Amino acid sequence: MLVWLAEHLVKYYSGFNVFSYLTFRAIVSLLTALFISLWMGPRMIARLQKLSFGQVVRNDGPESHFSKRGTPTMGGIMILTAITVSVLLWAYPSNPYVWCVLTVLIGYGIIGFVDDYRKVVRKDTKGLIARWKYFWMSVIALGVAFALYLAGKDTPATELVVPFFKDVMPQLGLLYILLAYFVIVGTGNAVNLTDGLDGLAIMPTVFVAAGFALVAWATGNMNFANYLHIPYLRHAGELVIVCTAIVGAGLGFLWFNTYPAQVFMGDVGSLALGGALGIIAVLLRQEFLLVIMGGVFVVETLSVILQVGSFKLRGQRIFRMAPIHHHYELKGWPEPRVIVRFWIISLMLVLIGLATLKVR
């Protein structure tokens, strides 16, 4: 929005030309989202406490979590607000990729909000019925995927980028819609499952978003895209603004979510952030890269699948409790140790993922 205004004002003062630089807008996008999160934090926490929107804690969970009961939740609202405002201010409003991300972000945020509302207000521990949650998540994911397929049919925008292999980018055709669906819905749920400890989900989200900011910049630059043998996508550059907004909003939220947390993001935050990372990976044609950089989310999800599958097939559990972060808690690891070690692993995976762009 401000970019368009600056384009009209540059004729009167050349200094407004700085708004045309992607690097400048990326930095101010991050700072804008960060400051909005920091400003909203105390006000949001006080409001949630006044409304008694407190966290519901399972009775069969680790005993250390019982003290978290009543901690304000639904703090993801401030994350979504910070991201949306920052993106609308600093990204080109005419960019279709930006609107794709905002559609998934806000759509999944609404689904998460309804889920949280049922849990904390109606005291329904199950929240939104699972089939309805997946139905609406699927509607949004399939709608966006179908629109992208129609817009990018038989172009690099619907090719599959395979890591480690130079110029191996098969055209997916209709399989693009199916892949996009699973990536968006799967990542939304994966981040949701990871959000079980103070700050555990938000920092890997920040790391992955930062990694995708670099990938988006390279993908939107023809010279670097050709150098790295990845598809050049002319709309991809503006995703840098979206990614840096996620980084800023995430760091601002972490200020209040770090152990011991003053607020939790709730499903309104985790589903939205996961869906946003998923659609960004789809837009950049880097679904495989998301699996590497978001390895923490993948392992958390696999631990639940393996736990449920093992119990149904063999009547035995593999882990003491799933997702796997609870397994380490029950082994005696202090919560901060689990969190920080998962952060370190996440950072390593993001760096490894970025390195694969050159190893071809």
UniProtKB/Swiss-Prot annotation:
Pfam families assigned to the protein according to its UniProt record, in alphabetical order: Glycos_transf_4 (PF00953), MraY_sig1 (PF10555)
Transmembrane segments: 26-46, 72-92, 94-114, 132-152, 168-188, 199-219, 236-256, 263-283, 288-308, 338-358
Cited PROSITE patterns: MRAY_1 (PS01347), MRAY_2 (PS01348)
This protein's pathway: Cell wall biogenesis; peptidoglycan biosynthesis
GO MF, any single term: UDP-N-acetylmuramoyl-L-alanyl-D-glutamyl-meso-2,6-diaminopimelyl-D-alanyl-D-alanine:undecaprenyl-phosphate transferase activity
Main location class: membrane
InterPro entries listed in its UniProt record: Glycosyl_transferase_4, PNAcMuramoyl-5peptid_Trfase, PNAcMuramoyl-5peptid_Trfase_CS
Required co-factors: Mg(2+)
CDD domains reported in the protein's UniProt record: GT_MraY (cd06852)
PANTHER family documented for this protein: PHOSPHO-N-ACETYLMURAMOYL-PENTAPEPTIDE-TRANSFERASE, PHOSPHO-N-ACETYLMURAMOYL-PENTAPEPTIDE-TRANSFERASE HOMOLOG
Protein's name according to its UniProt entry: Phospho-N-acetylmuramoyl-pentapeptide-transferase
Source organism: Klebsiella pneumoniae (strain 342)
Gene coding for it: mraY
